[in-house]
């Protein structure tokens, strides 16, 4: 093989930090008046007047090296929050200094809110609609902040103590933390921020249930399913309303609350859930599989682990590597065949994905030719052109639930009573994905209603599957959405959906 270079580990990156350094979190801070701490774009103005979590309300929490609860806060302008010798709160410095060190303490009322004590001054940080202040010797209502994690809500959950990933149990009524690698939809969790319920979090599973503190999954989210987020040396701890922390318990590593103190067993990281997909060959409508050995072959009628492949993007080559559950990569062999033999990502293990207007895609191999399906089902990189034997249909297997976001915000309803969707919301609606034929999917709301195209916009009011869509993977966390009629679902600056005829390059890429 060419270019035996870059081995890839399993760690996908702690996304609570938005892919910054480990232990750096990107957060919003909400005061007692339900307003976000804000760093205005001009004049280094500070206030607590933000209505929702947008760019100006984002803060990077950076750990210090001197204690797990001592942190720094950096604004979206890359300036550090600090308090001067006179008690003025500033955000103008490019560098950390003694006045920019804050100590986190957790409210004792069970709410999980944070108080931020400036280490050099000894006073607590508070906020008003006009400015930030640091004058309180003890924290009151104005000095307690609710923490809104700005990570993508759909994550893999990794235990720091056990060094294993969480997954849905076989019985689908518990979460077990014993997976070596996060494979399949069962390892995907949605960390739901509940602003109206004290800014706590619910852990939502792929089978549409919520984790109760007792370790069981249930359909309805109640008080026992809500947890506050705590920061411990760069890691996350989740505390229930009784003051006990989630951790893996026993030989099955069942995730439940038990301890009232935090050790490594109670700590977690939220990690990127890399896209995992299945492919159907256009020639025989069978799933591509490695079930029968090293040959990559389209010969299966159902999807299992051997028909699911993790797509890992090479940013320098702008191509994809496809990893199997046996930890091997698809690789172009000397004879042009595709075999799952490579344990490294090299040039012959990288493929370009080319999307077509009929919802199919093609793979271009390192030899410049397209993957074609032989009558036996075997894949060979021998096709000079894109014909039926070089077409495949794509399903995003480990996203049975989608959360979509664009530059304007999350996808959600215009108003609670209005079933039209907009894409400029501060909070999101989860979207259920139902697979149909030849890569087509139907999108469904929790109400049981389906997405329907209405003119150039989207309504969620169809009683049965109506309009289908194709999902096109463009980056590890971005997709384009194309209607059956070939138009892309686009986002306008005012937050409205619009079906566009724009080409592939200009289509809206939705973060998922």
Curated annotation (Swiss-Prot):
Single GO MF descriptor: protein-macromolecule adaptor activity
Organism domain of life: Eukaryota
Localization, UniProt: Cytoplasm, Cytoskeleton
GO terms under biological process: actin cytoskeleton organization; actin filament bundle assembly; antennal morphogenesis; cell migration; chaeta morphogenesis; cuticle pattern formation; dendrite development; epidermal cell differentiation
Chief site of localization: cytoplasm
One cellular-component annotation, GO: actin cytoskeleton
Cytoplasm listed as a keyword: yes
Entry keyword set: Actin-binding, Cytoplasm, Cytoskeleton, Developmental protein, Differentiation, Oogenesis
Cited function: Acts as an actin bundling protein. May have a role in the asymmetric organization and/or movement of cytoplasmic components. It has a role in somatic cells during the formation of adult bristles and hairs, and in the female germline during oogenesis.
Family membership: Belongs to the fascin family.
Subunit (UniProt): Interacts with Rab35, with stronger binding to the Rab35-GTP form compared to the Rab35-GDP form.
Protein name, as recorded: Protein singed
The organism of origin for this protein: Drosophila melanogaster
Record gene name: sn
């Amino acid at each position: 093989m060419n270019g035996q270079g870059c081995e890839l580990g399993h760690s996908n990156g702690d996304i609570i930090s938005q892919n910054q350094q480990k232990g750096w979190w990107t957060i919003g801070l909400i005061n007692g008046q339900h307003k976000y701490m804000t760093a205005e774009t001009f004049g280094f103005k500070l206030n607590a007047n933000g209505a929702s979590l947008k760019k100006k309300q984002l803060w990077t929490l950076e750990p210090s090296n001197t204690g797990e609860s001592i942190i720094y806060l950096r604004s979206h302008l890359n300036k550090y929050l600090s308090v001067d010798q006179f008690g003025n709160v500033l955000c103008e410095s490019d560098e950390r200094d003694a006045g920019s060190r804050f100590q986190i303490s957790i409210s004792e009322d069970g709410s999980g809110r944070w108080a931020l004590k400036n280490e050099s001054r000894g006073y607590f940080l508070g906020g008003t609609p006009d400015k930030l202040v640091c004058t309180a010797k003890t924290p009151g209502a104005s000095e307690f902040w609710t923490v809104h994690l700005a990570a993508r809500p759909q994550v893999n959950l990794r235990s720091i103590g056990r060094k294993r990933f969480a997954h849905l149990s076989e019985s689908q009524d518990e979460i077990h933390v014993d997976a070596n690698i996060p494979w399949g939809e069962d390892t995907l969790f949605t960390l739901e921020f509940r602003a109206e319920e004290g800014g706590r979090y619910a852990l939502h599973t792929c089978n549409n249930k919520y984790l109760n503190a007792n370790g069981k999954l249930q359909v309805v989210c109640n008080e026992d399913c809500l947890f506050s987020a705590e920061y411990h040396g760069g890691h996350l701890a989740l505390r229930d309303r009784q003051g006990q922390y989630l951790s893996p318990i026993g030989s099955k590593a069942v995730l439940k609350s038990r301890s009232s103190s935090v050790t490594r067993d109670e700590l977690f990281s939220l990690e990127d859930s890399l896209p995992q997909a299945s492919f159907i060959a256009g020639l025989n409508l069978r799933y591509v599989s490695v079930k029968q050995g090293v040959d990559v072959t389209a010969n299966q009628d159902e999807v299992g682990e051997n028909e699911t492949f993790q797509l890992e993007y090479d940013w320098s080559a702008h191509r994809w590597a496809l990893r199997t559950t046996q930890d091997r990569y698809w690789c172009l062999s000397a004879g042009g065949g595709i075999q799952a033999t490579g344990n490294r990502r090299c040039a012959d293990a990288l493929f370009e994905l080319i999307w077509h207007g009929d919802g199919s895609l093609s793979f271009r191999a390192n030899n410049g030719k397209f993957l074609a399906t032989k009558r036996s089902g075997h894949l060979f990189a021998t096709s000079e052109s894109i014909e039926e034997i070089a077409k495949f249909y794509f399903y995003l297997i480990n996203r049975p639930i989608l959360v979509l976001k664009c530059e304007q915000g999350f996808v959600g309803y215009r108003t609670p009573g209005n079933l039209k969707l907009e894409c400029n919301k501060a909070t999101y609606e989860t979207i259920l994905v139902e697979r149909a034929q030849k890569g087509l999917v139907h999108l469904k709301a929790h109400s049981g209603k389906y997405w329907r195209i209405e003119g150039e916009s989207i309504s969620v009011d169809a009683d049965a599957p109506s309009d289908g869509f194709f999902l096109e993977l463009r980056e590890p966390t971005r997709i384009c959405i194309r209607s059956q009629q070939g138009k892309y679902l686009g986002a306008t600056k005012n937050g409205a959906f619009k079906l566009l005829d724009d080409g592939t390059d200009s289509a809206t890429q939705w973060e998922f």
